[in-house]
Amino acid sequence: MPKRDIKAFLYDILSYMDDIINFTKDMDYEEFINNKAIKYAVIRCLEVIGEAVKKIPKDIREKYPHIPFKELAGMRDKLIHQYFGVDYLTVWETAKYEIPEIKKEFEKIIKDLEEK
């Protein structure tokens, strides 16, 4: 399998962030918590984002210290390994309030890389 470059991982992150935003659009917490399919889809997207973030090289992570790379990766680990202890309120708040803001930062990384 050919090695993927950093931009491929960044585009994966953006794609899954778009999915999260679209899945939770026009939805409140009560609807989210009662919609098993959306809950599971958002969790899966966060897992993939967390895995892709781990592929971002250290020099890029250091160049953008305000982006919560470590937290995104850590959330992935918690979601993968705590099957019965998922904090759905944290998942919701991350999906609804943090992902749209963080997405802008990942878009900036791609823009910066493409301008090189």
UniProtKB/Swiss-Prot annotation:
The modification O-di-AMP-tyrosine is found at residue 83. Keywords: Hydrolase, Nuclease, Nucleotide-binding, Phosphoprotein, Toxin-antitoxin system. One of its GO terms (cellular component) is toxin-antitoxin complex. Its EC number is 3.1.-.-. Modified by cognate antitoxin MJ0126; probably at least 2 successive AMPylation events occur on Tyr-83. The active site is at residues 76, 81. A motif (RX(4)HXY motif) lies at residues 76-83. Belongs to the HepT RNase toxin family. Homodimer, probably forms a complex with cognate antitoxin MJ0126. Probable toxic component of a putative type VII toxin-antitoxin (TA) system, probably an RNase. Probably neutralized by cognate antitoxin MJ0126. Neutralization may be due to AMPylation by MJ0126. This is Putative RNase MJ0125.
